[in-house]
């Protein structure tokens, strides 16, 4: 007779009015999780930075006004005019015609920064989804441990009543009663530890999702997203992982930063329109109006080596970005390998724990029968109870660890949100339209 007593114990867990699936938990967290909102705020701010850079393509219009007392003295020391209230009013319109490609490169750099920040946002959402999935599954496991612990107490209480009855008949000693009571106290302690863990998990869930868990449903990972081998898993991770994509865009942004700094080696050409309407200027009473349109050029011949130093600094930042990209590749490969190993071995391990439950259950039943006829000691019976309790806990743990390993492996390949069928917020989708078409092409360059 098999006595797994694991998954069936969880059937009564769903008893609240509203159901909250894993997918719904992730979707809700994407809207209100503070850590994710931080990433989103940075993503939005980058768009504003790009808009600010783009403004250099447009005319710059400024209005100037001034008024005050003017006194002019000739070289001979005589006052030219006694009192005049000088008034100035001017309008200047400047259109940049050539900035050494500074605006072009800055806009291009920020476009890559936007793409990098979006991938960082997706990566944060992927990792948050994994955290929620793990806590979600741990809640089920903790509920199972609670029920196992309660049954363990019930079993020991039955044994205690039986031993007390036997002691009254002279078939067992007071030491036997004390021994069972000691084991019962340990069982109560284990139950309290299980309750503590369960409520800690509820707090963790609240931290991630923003609400306390109510009615949960056992999740099942879509096996279509589970790779068949480690090689396939690594290949998917390299192609899809948002951290890798973000690091690639960071390198491209660093390249554009170099080009932007080099723009200071070029002259700047502007078209400038000035219109002035003044009064009492230069000691002459009355209006003094003028207007002009000029083509201006400025060329920085020497800046103390600043331009060269800034260009070299940008080149080193590119090297830093490349090193981060290479390290990201290694971390993704390592994470995928660890996730694959966990998934593979916990699946095999679960089969042995199942056998452990079978044999421990058979041994416990046999020991109890032998104890009744005096062929086994009370200690043997109690030890067999503990062994069965531990075997059931191990099988319970392995069953849920297998589920956690499945989600971890899918996350390692960068496809967890897709597997959960969770749509990212609409604001992400709108920004995505601006940059996603070229994302794959840029990553593959």
Task: Briefly describe each language-model feature range.
Residues 20, 125-238, 250, 339-342, ...:
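Periplasmic alpha-helical coiled-coil/stalk elements that build and connect Gram-negative outer-membrane
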